[in-house]
């Protein structure tokens, strides 16, 4: 009886070790499809995750939260924000072999109202987002020229406008 229990325990430990090793191998081989930069606004997070899933990313991306996304990168009041973002992109590239950065702005953004007050209409705000996304994307390309930068804006009705991609 003792011998059978020991054999079963040994088999269980071997099986657990094998599962653990397989899990570790999966973790080592993990490549993320993208590095997603989203705003901290809680109203849009679920819709952004749903959009990324719909586009085939599931949750296979690294995520970074930055108030205002593009304006958060471009504003000068808190220069450490962009510095920290660029450091995280480099880490993601090194660890998870990302090939793309996705900048996901949204309209009705408090950071835009804080750093760029004065727009009066949805279209004025949208135009400002497009302008700031271009500047932010160019900054990212200057730091990591081998990565694509995809820029998009979520509208009030939760539709997503894919603005442009820098290759």
Show the residue positions of the predicted features.
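A short beta-strand-loop structural module common to alpha/beta enzyme folds
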Residues: 59-69
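Divalent-metal-activated hydrolytic enzyme cores
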Residues: 3-48, 67-83, 91-100, 110-167
